[in-house]
Structures are given as structure tokens and as C-alpha cells.
């Protein structure tokens, strides 16, 4: 079995019994052995951990780049929405976003950060988005392709 993490296919291998937890090492995902249902739960938890670390870092980097203040990043299990932004500056991202390529992940992060400037989807917002993510359409296509992989997790 393989999984997709930040756009890369990675093999899933059994973790040594003494490790007791999932981990990423040398381009492989190691999961403790268990039933299919247990492995699915472990894989989701692995994705959530990876998402929190990666997306928090990227959101902070992009926020600093744009001079935008954010109030934390939360990881959700949303299936229909990649991300959202609260009026108070909290960013929410689905852990499933971690399956997308890095440029598509950044496009979603930047999209949500632009809501800190323009809290709607007006023409002004779209102009900001286009200026800061010139390849937004290509990223949207990548995200649609990524969404096809949701069924098994």
C-alpha cells in the first residue's frame, strides 16, 4: 500500500511492534500492524499529526510574508472544504489537504490568508488571490485530482 503525502507517493510499511506509533522515516510511512479498521484510524491520526506540523509552519511563513496576523491553525476532518478562515483570524484546514502537491497546499493557505484582508469572495478578493497565486486554476485542478483519493481513508 502507498499513501500520498505533500504530493509524493510513499510506501506504507509495518512499524516495529516496540515503536507503538506511526511515523515518517526516510520516505516511508510506518504504521503499527492491526486490522484494516485499526490501520485506517492510525493512518488518519498520522495524517492529522503531519498536517498540524506542516500546515501550521506554512501558514505562519505565508502570514509573515504578507504581514498578516493569524490566531492559530486547527486541523479538521472536512471532506468538502480544504480550508476556512474565521473572522478572528483562526485558520482551519482539512488533514486531507496533506495529500495534495505543495503548490496546491500553498494556494489553499494563501486563499485563506487573503480572507484576512477581504473576508468574502468579491472581485476584490479574486484580484488579491490572482495576484498572489497566479497558478490558482492549475492548483484547483490538482486539488480536484487529490480529492479522488479520499474514498479509501
Give the location of each predicted region.
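Active-site-proximal or metal-binding-adjacent scaffold patches in catalytic folds
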Residues: 1-107, 116-153
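Walker B catalytic acidic pair
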Residues: 112
Amino acid at each position: 500500500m502507498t499513501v500520498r503525502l505533500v504530493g509524493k507517493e510513499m510506501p506504507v510499511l509495518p512499524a516495529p511492534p516496540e515503536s507503538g506509533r506511526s511515523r515518517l522515516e526516510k520516505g516511508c510511512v510506518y504504521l503499527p500492524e492491526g486490522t484494516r479498521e485499526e490501520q485506517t484510524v492510525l493512518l488518519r491520526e498520522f495524517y492529522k499529526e503531519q498536517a498540524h506540523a506542516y500546515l501550521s509552519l506554512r501558514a505562519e511563513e505565508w502570514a509573515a510574508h504578507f504581514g498578516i496576523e493569524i490566531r492559530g491553525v486547527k486541523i479538521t476532518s472536512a471532506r468538502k472544504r480544504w480550508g476556512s478562515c474565521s473572522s478572528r483570524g483562526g485558520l482551519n484546514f482539512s488533514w486531507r489537504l496533506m495529500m495534495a502537491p505543495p503548490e496546491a497546499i500553498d494556494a489553499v493557505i494563501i486563499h485563506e490568508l487573503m480572507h484576512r484582508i477581504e473576508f468574502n469572495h468579491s472581485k476584490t478578493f479574486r484580484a488579491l488571490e490572482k495576484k498572489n497565486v497566479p497558478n490558482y486554476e492549475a492548483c484547483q485542478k490538482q486539488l480536484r485530482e487529490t480529492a479522488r483519493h479520499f474514498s479509501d481513508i
